[in-house]
Amino acid sequence: MFFHQYTTQMKENRRGLIPILLSLVLILASCASLTKTQKGAAVGTAAGAGMGAVIGRASGNTALGAIIGAAVGGATGAIIGNKMDKQAEEIKKTVPDAEVIRVGEGIVVEFSSKILFAFDKSNLSSEAMANLDKLIVVLKNYPDTNIEIQGHTDSKGTEAYNQNLSVQRANSVSAYLAKKGVSASRLTVKGFGESLPKYVNDTAEGREQNRRVEFLISANEKMKAEAEKQAKQ
């Protein structure tokens, strides 16, 4: 779901990724015995913030790009990746209505807006609260992570209206998480409006998929420090 139905513009942007991604593929292809976590650590070492930004923009997934860009890499990154593997599996089991993808040293969790909000609204539905309650249980089990909440819309309406709506929705989710006991210091909010579609906006199905909220889950400084210490032992 994350890597199909891209717009023509996004396909053009992705051409610029080919040399970069080929380099990563060549590195990892020679390491067939690596685990998913170890491969994530290798990608983190090779990537860096610049590549993360390029990948995020070209794929229409800024959460994915930010995780790649913030990767620590090496042995420390592998330890963080192992912890993220466990958290991702727990989210998949606990929140079946969410799409969960493991990327390097982080996790992207995506909810369709129809699960969280009524059309053109920013107040959470009862179904939304039920799904977020499930996610909150897992987030509390892993307190040493930061959570960036990103709002996205389709292209219906004006850019300004959609930008404002995306921010309002992300803020609604953040406020609910904080109200339910997730530390506000872990939460940041971003709204992207219609600027980063992952799917075509020419169809009702594509527009529905573009109306989404994404969670970027990454290691905080405490987890990074502990992983670095463990890697040196």
Predicted regions and their residues:
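Bacterial N-terminal signal peptides that target proteins for export
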Residues: 4-21
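Extracytoplasmic/secreted proteins, especially bacterial periplasmic and envelope-associated proteins
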Residues: 41-42, 46-53, 66, 86, ...
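Periplasmic peptidoglycan-binding/anchoring modules of Gram-negative envelope and division proteins
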Residues: 93-94, 117-151, 178, 208, ...
